[in-house]
Amino acid sequence: GLKDWWNKHKDKIIDVVKEMGKAGLQAA
């Protein structure tokens, strides 16, 4: 289910979100 998918991918997703957040802050 979704929870298994999230647990498998969450570390990568969190890294991507952090990178997008940094890029957004720099662009602002």
Curated annotation (Swiss-Prot):
Keywords: Amidation, Antibiotic, Antimicrobial, Fungicide, Secreted. One of its GO terms (biological process) is defense response to fungus. Expressed by the venom gland. One of its GO terms (cellular component) is extracellular region. The keyword Secreted applies. The modification Alanine amide is found at A28. It is found in: Secreted. Its main location: secreted. The synthetic peptide has antimicrobial activity against the Gram-positive bacteria B.amyloliquefacies S499 (MIC=0.05 mM), L.monocytogenes 2231 and S.aureus ATCC 29213, against the Gram-negative bacteria P.putida BTP1, P.aeruginosa PaO1 and E.coli ATCC 10536, and against the fungi S.cerevisiae, R.mucilaginosa and C.cucumerinum. It is not active against the fungi F.oxysporum and B.cinerea. This is M-poneritoxin-Da4b. It comes from Dinoponera australis. The lineage of its organism: Eukaryota, Metazoa, Ecdysozoa, Arthropoda, Hexapoda.
